[in-house]
């Protein structure tokens, strides 16, 4: 079911092998692009307690979603905050993993003299309070 839902709502589903195997989300999602190479909405995250919304626009065919299950509190971030187990998420626009081994995937090969570019926009909004 790909309908919007809270991340924590399903992250512990041990009956769903991809979540159980990785102890949470670490998946690449194939985006439904209107046209290859165009910048379009890739993902949206919303925190109802703060009213903060993040929209991600990108020209990439995939989005890697990682939910921090590899964090153990040893890394320290801003203001001395520790990066603990599942204490954050990463949404990374990219090509498909293993693309060089699949002729039907967009190419990720960069040849000598070629230039690689990609465009990603992280846009933030807040609810009117």
Where do the PLM segments sit?
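Active-site pocket scaffolds in enzymes
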Residues: 1-129
């Amino acid at each position: 079911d790909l309908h919007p839902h809270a991340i924590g709502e399903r992250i512990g589903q041990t009956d769903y092998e991809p979540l159980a195997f990785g102890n949470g989300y670490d998946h690449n999602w194939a985006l439904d692009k209107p046209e290859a190479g165009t910048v379009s909405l890739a993902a949206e995250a919303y925190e109802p307690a703060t009213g903060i919304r993040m929209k991600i626009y990108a020209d990439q065919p995939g989005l890697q979603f990682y939910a921090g299950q590899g964090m153990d509190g040893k890394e320290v971030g801003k203001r001395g905050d520790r990066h603990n187990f599942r204490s954050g998420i990463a949404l990374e626009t990219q090509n498909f993993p293993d693309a060089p081994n699949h002729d039907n995937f967009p190419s990720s090969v960069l040849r000598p003299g070629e230039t690689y570019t990609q465009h990603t926009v992280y846009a933030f909004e807040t609810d009117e309070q």
